[in-house]
């Protein structure tokens, strides 16, 4: 099977081309993918596909979504956390968050992460490998199957750095956005990055209308370098310049993610410095109480300090929200469940 291709890694155009090359009508490609997006992963169960075609498909492709290793539902049932396993045994996490306006899934783009952000559990142990776009898509399809509900929004904020897996991340976006795919609007898709400056500029040229989220977490280089190794490669000034380039190219508002760590980046002077840094930008700041990680000693800011930080930004004209905490009772923060699973098993999976 591992010498064959997962059909989920093919776009409609790819499959049309394959059909033509194999002397079949190209409309069969859409019929096959229609079944796939309905959750049918057995070629023989595709009732309107002739046997001669299903035989060819079985000889060249396999259809696989990840299996569920563990599933956790929060007490209020607003959050469902999945540990998914791929065919090679690697484990990743996905989280479904249920809102009044629809269901959002947080997907992983890599197994582990090499970026080394110190407040993120996903990066402990480094990166194992990147996921193909079909493997990322499989998270969405499996989550829909497990919850019995449609996913209407996607955030690429799970383990991994999407821009370090650039081609697969963009192919995934285009596949879920396609009318013949999940038909999720680009403005309902958010890509989060720690700030790989050249890739942000490259993304600006892609003619996409997705939301770009930047993990900023500090108003200056000195603080940012303490928690994010990427800050030693690209300065805050370079990052903001790339963000302004992205805004000018796409006319899309950028979200800046800011995890508040007690006595590190949460003082009034930091809020004022951040307000100055972002003044005049088409942007929004999302303040995040930092998550507790067993291996780390970070402490979240107090509720009062978070509110005060928010008020300073708001008074400076910076659109600001405080992230609603969801799934805290099931360790739904990025990387925590996978890390615990790996620690409790004698062999890395």
Curated annotation (Swiss-Prot):
Pfam families named among the record's database cross-references: Radical_SAM, RlmN_N
The protein's role, per its UniProt record: Specifically methylates position 2 of adenine 2503 in 23S rRNA and position 2 of adenine 37 in tRNAs.
EC number: 2.1.1.192
Taxonomic source organism: Clostridium tetani (strain Massachusetts / E88)
Record flagged with keyword Cytoplasm: yes
Positions contributing to [4Fe-4S] cluster binding: 113, 117, 120
Keyword Oxidoreductase: no
Radical SAM core domain mapped to chain residues: 99-329
Family: Belongs to the radical SAM superfamily. RlmN family.
Protein name in the entry: Probable dual-specificity RNA methyltransferase RlmN
Disulfide bonds: 106-334
General remark: Reaction proceeds by a ping-pong mechanism involving intermediate methylation of a conserved cysteine residue.
Any one GO MF annotation of this record: metal ion binding
Cofactors (names): [4Fe-4S] cluster
Catalytic residues as annotated in Swiss-Prot or TrEMBL: 93, 334
Keywords: 4Fe-4S, Cytoplasm, Disulfide bond, Iron, Iron-sulfur, Metal-binding, Methyltransferase, rRNA processing, S-adenosyl-L-methionine, Transferase, tRNA processing
């Amino acid at each position: 099977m591992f010498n064959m291709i997962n059909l989920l890694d093919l776009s409609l155009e790819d499959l049309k081309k394959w059909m033509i090359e194999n002397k079949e009508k190209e409309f069969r490609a859409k019929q096959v993918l229609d079944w796939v997006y309905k959750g049918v992963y057995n070629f023989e169960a595709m009732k309107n596909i002739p046997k001669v075609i299903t035989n060819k498909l079985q000889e060249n492709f396999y259809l696989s979504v990840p299996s569920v290793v563990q599933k956790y539902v929060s007490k209020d049932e607003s959050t469902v956390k999945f540990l998914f396993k791929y065919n090679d045994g690697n484990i990743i996490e996905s989280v479904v968050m249920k809102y009044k306006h629809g269901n959002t899934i947080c997907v992983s783009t890599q197994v582990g992460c090499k970026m080394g952000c110190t407040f993120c559990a996903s990066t402990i142990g480094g990166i194992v490998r990147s996921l193909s776009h079909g493997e990322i898509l499989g998270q969405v399809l499996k989550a829909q199957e497990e919850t019995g509900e449609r996913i209407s929004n996607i955030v690429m904020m799970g383990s991994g750095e999407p821009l370090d897996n650039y081609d697969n991340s963009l192919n995934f976006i285009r596949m879920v956005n396609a009318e013949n795919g999940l038909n999720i609007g680009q403005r309902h898709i958010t890509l989060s990055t720690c700030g790989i400056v050249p890739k942000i500029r490259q993304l600006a040229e892609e003619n996409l209308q997705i939301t770009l989220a930047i993990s900023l977490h500090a108003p200056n280089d000195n603080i940012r370098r303490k928690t994010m190794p990427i800050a030693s490669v690209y300065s805050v000034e370079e990052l903001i310049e790339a963000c302004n380039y992205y805004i000018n190219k796409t006319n899309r508002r950028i979200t800046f993610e800011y995890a508040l760590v007690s006595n590190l980046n949460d003082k009034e002077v930091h809020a004022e410095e951040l307000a100055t840094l972002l003044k005049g930008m088409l942007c929004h700041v999302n303040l995040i109480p930092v998550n507790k990680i067993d291996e780390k000693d970070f402490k979240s800011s107090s509720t009062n300090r978070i509110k005060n930080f928010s008020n300073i930004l708001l008074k400076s004209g910076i659109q600001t929200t405080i992230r609603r905490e969801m799934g805290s009772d099931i360790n739904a923060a990025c990387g925590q469940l996978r890390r615990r699973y790996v620690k409790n098993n004698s062999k890395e999976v």
